[in-house]
Amino acid sequence: MDNDRQKALDTVIKNMEKSFGKGAVMKLGDNKARKVSSVSSGSVTLDNALGVGGYPKGRIVEIYGPESSGKTTVALHAIAEVQKNGGVAAFIDAEHALDPVYAEALGVDIQNLYLSQPDHGEQGLEIAEAFVRSGAVDIVVVDSVAALTPKAEIEGEMGDTHVGLQARLMSQALRKLSGAISKSNTTAVFINQIREKVGVMFGNPEVTPGGRALKFYSSVRLEVRRAEQLKQGQEIVGNRTKIKVVKNKVAPPFRVAEVDIMYGKGISKEGELIDLGAEHEIVNKSGAWYSYNGERMGQGKENVKLYLKENPAIREEIDQKLREKLGIFDGDVEEKEAESPATLFDEEE
């Protein structure tokens, strides 16, 4: 570019920075923020599937799936990890159904968790926005989008129709929130439910409530589904759960993480260390016996889980070796966008 044109451009940029503040316009090569840092999901398997070592900071994440599939459990594990690293977490409980005893069992510091149980959707989203704009909160979880009922619907009569009201509410809220989330470096997690669209003859009839806006604004979308029941004898003690990365703007998508969610305990970290450790030859498996560094840990997965619980130093050592081998670390991955082809039909906005 010749000098006259460069001077004209520099003058325009200076004027813009005077009007809108420093950093309003920059060269992409100078933008350090294009590298994405992350917060751990609390699961090595899921961190690996997400590709950047966890949920990206300054981004929107949607977790959806059928009832009792483990959506809230997955979100609570992320809160526990943030708090463990000295961060601040907020939980917008629109469903009014958070179990503090269960949250504490998952490792959440309930004494220092900021909780809001809003009366209507507008209030819940305004509280979420206030937390984000403060710049002091590391993660905000909204549980759930389907429960963010517009004020007009709550104050109306039973049977009144409110076509597209919730979708418009979400669309407006996300337009306001997205910029603030990016600037504050807050991770915003929206939990969503699933509905079935009437009259769909071909394809998937499942839809997520709240319109299309959340799908567009989300950098990561996770689909959580139960795969099978886990039993000890005749007693059902948990579920094998599949978490599919349906959309990922910060790493390759379509990866699947399989975890054991145990009733009352959450994701079994010992279970995933055994599975991943054996797969990557950090843990040796011979028949039903598992060993580490030549020392036998036990026969059968449940016995080895118990061994790892009783030996936290060995558990942490295996965890560290796995993270090094899988290259799980904070951020520094450039954006790549791709999404699973139309896994969900959309509600009308």
From Swiss-Prot:
One of its GO terms (biological process) is DNA recombination. Keywords: ATP-binding, Cytoplasm, DNA damage, DNA recombination, DNA repair, DNA-binding, Nucleotide-binding, SOS response. CDD domains: RecA. It comes from the Bacteria. GO terms for molecular function: ATP binding; ATP hydrolysis activity; ATP-dependent DNA damage sensor activity; damaged DNA binding; single-stranded DNA binding. Its main location: cytoplasm. Pfam families: RecA, RecA_C. Gene3D superfamilies: P-loop containing nucleotide triphosphate hydrolases. ATP binds at residues 65-72. It is found in: Cytoplasm. Transmembrane segments: none annotated. One of its GO terms (cellular component) is cytosol. NCBIfam families: tigrfam_recA. Can catalyze the hydrolysis of ATP in the presence of single-stranded DNA, the ATP-dependent uptake of single-stranded DNA by duplex DNA, and the ATP-dependent hybridization of homologous single-stranded DNAs. It interacts with LexA causing its activation and leading to its autocatalytic cleavage. Belongs to the RecA family. This is Protein RecA.
